[in-house]
């Protein structure tokens, strides 16, 4: 209802976030091209970073040392090249990707699986502030919505939708990362994967997008 929408807007603004509808001229153009484009995005920071070339770096929360180094190298390389890094601010690969991009002077965008006024995981509150100061944190969910397991697969279409391509850094066979890669393929985005240890369980999801072409 209109009353609920006004309350949501008020809550977001109190938190310091803005609201961008898909008919807004500044709404990310690439996102408009995808099926099930979000009607609104709550934005903390500056979403103009989405106008640059964007690449999503995604992967497991339970990363290996190899995965960490790969995410760090990619995040730094993309950030230093003026390419915006998009990820989900989860533990592991996402966190390293965001941090390393910012450390290289780059812009980054985090797509949350909860409302903009919440932070998941909670220990990434400081990272959230850093991302908002060097890009944007976005969410399509109501501002106070708590994280739910069903929200993460839904938001993954936005991670791939904002991006020209998705790079799977390290992932298990059945994972949210695989969902993001599948969305990317459906959206006509390029999908890349970091070569990994074929014997590691956290690499099985890395090879899946390669097999799917």
Descriptions of predicted regions:
Residues 7-14, 18-213:
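Glycine-biased, small-residue-rich flexible motifs in mid-sequence functional cores and linkers
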